[in-house]
Amino acid sequence: MPSLRTRREEAEMELSAPGPSPWTPAAQARVSDAPAVTHPGSAACGTPCCSDTELEAICPHYQQPDCDTRTEDKEFLHKEDIHEDLESQAEISENYAGDVFQVPKLGDLCDDVSERDWGVPEGRRLPQSLSQEGDFTPAAMGLLRGPLGEKDLDCNGFDSRFSLSPNLMACQEIPXXERPHPYDMGGQSFQHSVDLTGHEGVPTAESPLICNECGKTFRGNPDLIQRQIVHTGEASFMCDDCGKTFSQNSVLKNRHRSHMSEKAYQCSECGKAFRGHSDFSRHQSHHSSERPYTCTECGKAFSQNSSLKKHQKSHMSEKPYECNECGKAFRRSSNLIQHQRIHSGEKPYVCSECGKAFRRSSNLIKHHRTHTGEKPFECGECGKAFSQSAHLRKHQRVHTGEKPYECNDCGKPFSRVSNLIKHHRVHTGEKPYKCSDCGKXFSQSSSLIQHRRIHTGEKPHVCNVCGKAFSYSSVLRKHQIIHTGEKPYRCSVCGKAFSHSSALIQHQGVHTGDKPYACHECGKTFGRSSNLILHQRVHTGEKPYECTECGKTFSQSSTLIQHQRIHNGLKPHECNQCGKAFNRSSNLIHHQKVHTGEKPYTCVECGKGFSQSSHLIQHQIIHTGERPYKCSECGKAFSQRSVLIQHQRIHTGVKPYDCAACGKAFSQRSKLIKHQLIHTRE
């Protein structure tokens, strides 16, 4: 491919050759009407390129005898040649107010010179939408600056050399009326507000630039362009390491940091290391109770400046933008525009994939990532990627330990505002989620969803081993341990292992004697909250579990299940030694001790062993002389409940034990057994 210098030489030859002039008619007319002037290099080219006025306007060094500034390899000055610094454009005089040039399209600069031919890196090339426009804004041209330095570009149709800068111009005209930013101090005009800002040295607030998409205002044209790229979804900044593209240069810089393996910032307290200084500073604030950021309005202190800024917004009363529908006021006009779409129902941003519409362009961009699978926000610590920046910020708190949301009642901090809202209901007792079937209320929506499965019978969580279904995922996880036999939770005192953490916690109460759950009626304490709930039904008399066969009610669901086996004759618990079956697992456990001879329950008074704890309790009454079971009819007391029940049959006359041979009834089972011996002798 011919070099750019070869093309420039060819262009100079073509410019001197006969044929149609490459100058625009308006430019030719302006030059022909103005008095010709000579300049350094005019003898070499033989062309009076501009008038005295124009030359002075374009080059501030003109008529300065001590200045011999020239650009690289430039023998003479054309009106297209300008210096790259912003001061040259800022010093255009009012005598040249009618001649402001428009930046050409890339294709107009040179038909056969592409961005690649110019040496523009792929990561800095312009988006397609910008490269097809007629004007290059300063921000757009800024994409082309940097590695190119001071390279001159030649156009085949002109003897013009262009430097890649915001001041690149072509021989095209823009009327003076289209320059919206006059400068009162010197009468100078600029095509872009950012040029005026650079001239004044102070950002202008009187003439802000407004985004047509969202109504947000900007002080500079580059900020506006960057905002518009967010709406279009174009990604113009490419990462050299992984090839991923981004719409903002700041995001690209963050991406570069994620590729860096070095974690330069290490905490002296805990040794944790961070790549970014902001994450490091945020983390350090959690080691100390220092809160250096104080609100001047109410005196409340914060450990982070960002938390203070969020808090200060609550004191801001000025909201000049008011909705004429509902009267709600906003601090920003863009927020009002977005709010008004709630009343109008307008959803101007439509997904081209599924047709779903959104009120905000940002929501459309987020939604579109569900189709593309794009996750542009990556954690610099662990590399995990997210589709939304908010999700990344929440995730980063896992690494930093930051908990910026603090409960005003108890001071407990949380990493997420949603968790703070849920926690606050503990103090208020609020239960906003109500079941439409039974009226029961819940503090969390997830609890309501799980509760409703009682009414619907839905069991969405299925075991992939045996196919058994469950209403709750937690119950499924517990069930799956049956198949694996895993017992990952081990007691540090006795070494006993458990399949569930809750079972380990309950077991540890045996060693500590801790019984934190107390009944407010009688003061009895329990090691498990579930046992307290069951106990409280003794006081309330509540029996919520009813048998559908006989109507009998029970205080515990397990008792109902055991009772129902009487009706269906089911005895699922079978002894593997003798084959005897039982309707309760507890009865099987007791029975198996007959085969093993195990008597784990020993009396501390006499050393006698028992296979069941209930037998030990009954035995201990012998030593204490306690008789807690008293007859309500005659006042007689007994050491065992079973003996009291037998005694009460004297008063009631109940004889539940019938002889199958003769039909005679007895109040005690032992008497029936003795009676049956009469029939066996016969």
Swiss-Prot record:
GO terms for biological process: cell division; cellular response to sodium dodecyl sulfate; negative regulation of apoptotic process; positive regulation of cell cycle phase transition; positive regulation of cell division; positive regulation of cell population proliferation; positive regulation of erythrocyte differentiation; positive regulation of kinase activity. Disulfide bonds: none annotated. Residues 62-210 are annotated as: Necessary for transcription activation. Interacts with INCA1; the interaction inhibits INCA1 activity and induces the cell cycle process. The gene is ZNF16. It is found in: Nucleus. InterPro entries: C2H2-ZF_Transcription_Reg, Znf_C2H2_sf, Znf_C2H2_type. This is Zinc finger protein 16. Residues 268-393, 341-373, 473-503 are annotated as: Required for nuclear localization. Residues 1-38 are annotated as: Disordered. GO terms for molecular function: DNA-binding transcription factor activity, RNA polymerase II-specific; RNA polymerase II cis-regulatory region sequence-specific DNA binding; zinc ion binding. Belongs to the krueppel C2H2-type zinc-finger protein family. Pfam families: zf-C2H2. Acts as a transcriptional activator. Promotes cell proliferation by facilitating the cell cycle phase transition from the S to G2/M phase. Involved in both the hemin- and phorbol myristate acetate (PMA)-induced erythroid and megakaryocytic differentiation, respectively. Also plays a role as an inhibitor of cell apoptosis. The modification N6-acetyllysine is found at residue 487. Keywords: Acetylation, Activator, Cell cycle, Cell division, DNA-binding, Isopeptide bond, Metal-binding, Mitogen, Nucleus, Repeat, Transcription, Transcription regulation, Ubl conjugation, Zinc, Zinc-finger. Residues 1-10 have a biased composition (Basic and acidic residues). GO terms for cellular component: nucleus. A zinc finger (C2H2-type) spans 209-231, 237-259, 265-287, 293-315, 321-343, 349-371, 377-399, 405-427, 433-455, 461-483, 489-511, 517-539, 545-567, 573-595, 601-623, 629-651, 657-679.
